[in-house]
């Protein structure tokens, strides 16, 4: 069975350990729901240095490209920041379905 791609977004807190743990849990939930999750925060920081302006821009471009290839945008968490708003706007413009996760299912 081919799983549709689900782009995972959230207003990440900025603490790498916390963000990675939450992202992995969100991805697991999307996987269990039948999707192939795509979550750039899980791997882009491994090779993109956001302190370098060109790399920061390239990271944004890569995230947008991944979102464009996705079938659904999954918005996670209770907060919405500018990155999440931008993801929602891109998804809307491209007619990509957007949904949220039931956060009561996440156990921290």
Short names for language-model regions:
Residues 8-9, 76:
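Short hydrophobic segments within beta-strands
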Residues 66, 103-104:
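Short, highly charged low-complexity linear segments
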Residues 106-108:
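Conserved small/polar residues in nucleotide/adenosyl-binding loops
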Residues 99-101:
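Short acidic-hydrophobic, aromatic-tinged amphipathic segments that line or gate anion-handling sites
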